[in-house]
Regions:
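Short alpha-helical Gxxx[C/S/T] motif in the catalytic ATP-binding
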Residues: 83, 87
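Short beta-strand/loop element within the Bergerat-fold HATPase_c
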Residues: 32-44
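Conserved glycine-rich
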Residues: 95-96
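Short conserved segment of the HATPase_c
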Residues: 45, 57-70
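Acidic ATP/Mg2+-coordinating residue in the GHKL
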Residues: 52
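Short helix-loop "hinge" at the ATP-lid/N-box region of the Bergerat-fold HATPase_c
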Residues: 25-26
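Conserved micro-motifs of the catalytic ATP-binding
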Residues: 6-9
Length: 119
């Protein structure tokens, strides 16, 4: 974990949101793969970036991965499709945003952003 900057928010709920995203990354990253978590800030916002070198997100799945009960085509069938939707709700409830980007063939990247003065 590489961290810089300060963050103000609900620690428990934010930890839950980040944990759900990391769990999703773990499910789609092969054994021996890498998951990185970075934090940064500037005058406008604090940001948490989570990257993996797993299977990436298919273009068909990308617009839907934060929808409740949505399971991607690469899903192992064990999940309920709730974790990423819950993460988005937690982050939005604190005035933040979360977005996912496909880094295929080298994985996915999730960016959580909290604007200063809103949390």
């Amino acid at each position: 974990i590489h961290a810089a900057g300060a963050f103000r928010g609900d620690f428990s709920w934010t930890s839950e949101a980040i944990g759900n995203i990391v769990k999703n990354c773990m499910e789609h990253t092969p054994e021996g793969g890498r998951i990185e978590i970075d934090a940064a800030e500037n005058a406008l916002f604090s940001e948490i970036i989570i990257k993996d070198n797993g299977t990436g997100i298919s273009p068909e799945d990308l617009p839907h991965i934060f929808e409740r009960f949505y399971k991607g085509k690469d899903s192992d069938g064990k999940s309920f499709g709730i974790g990423l939707a819950l993460s988005r709700m937690i982050i939005a409830g604190q005035g933040g945003t979360v977005k996912a980007e496909n880094r295929k063939p080298v994985g996915a990247m999730f960016t959580i952003r909290f604007y200063k003065g809103t949390v």
